[in-house]
Amino acid sequence: MPRKPRFYLPDVPVHVVQRGHSQEAVFYEEADYRAYLDWLEEAAERYDCAVHSYVLMTKHIHILATPSARDGVSRMMQYIGRRYVPYINDTHGSSGTLWEGRYKASLIQEE
């Protein structure tokens, strides 16, 4: 059965959560956080997503972003994942998936 397509709207904020596979760490040292943030900055600029805030925890991440285009958040997260996962696997001698499935995303409504 195919996955449900994600639903985003341009200029509507999105809360993104991505967790480590089997509740494992996704950041091991300071350089890992820096690498992730560098790619987040590149991706946000490339796909025109305004990143309002983020929290990088040892085992998961939170990002609050507003995309200008409908596919901005998806493209941003794909860009980061295609760089960060191989970086972790190469740097720390691991292999396979880093994340627990797809990231979760929720539209943020105004009151």
Please identify what each model-predicted range represents.
Residues 1-111:
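Short catalytic/metal-binding and nucleic-acid-binding patches
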